[in-house]
Amino acid sequence: TFEKLETKEQVMQFYDVLQINLKKLGLKSVHSYEDLIDLKYNRFVQEIEFYGVFLESKMIAGSMVFLFDGSIMHTQYLSSDEQYQKLFPMDFLIYHLIECAVEKQLELFTFGICTENQGRYLNFGLSRFKEGFGTEFCLNKSFEKRLLLS
């Protein structure tokens, strides 16, 4: 089943799934569990939502989303439990997130980058997966200024 996560305990379940996934990829989360709770319940109460996919009572996929300007839903984190990949929980999650965006009458659903190594390489598999939902890619401009420090 697909559910909006309402409690801190549910957010912890999501965070656990996220950490397992990141560890498998050799990555670390930008945010701690405490950060996510602070962001959701203190700083961006209306702008951040969490969603999960459950098999019975076990969360097998989840997402943290940002709602921008009443027109955009952006997935900040998407994660699933690798043990349940044969059930396609990520597909199920994204389908229902898109449904939520439609119900909220939002204009755009974005689900982030498809690059690795700070944008140096395109992850073709991830790109194809996202394009499978009828999405189109867009390029994000990046600006930098080199500073000469003595």
Can you say where each PLM-predicted feature lies in the sequence?
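A general structural detector for well-ordered alpha-helical segments in enzyme core domains, enriched
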Residues: L39, L93, L97, L126-K130
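Accessory, usually C-terminal, subdomains that scaffold auxiliary metal cofactors
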Residues: Y41, Y84-F88, N117-N123
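Conserved acetyl-CoA-binding loop-helix of GNAT-fold acetyltransferases
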Residues: Q85-A101
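Active-site/acyl-donor-binding loops of N-acyltransferases
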Residues: K104-S150
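A conserved beta-strand-loop-helix scaffold within acyl/acetyltransferase catalytic domains
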Residues: T1-Y84, C100
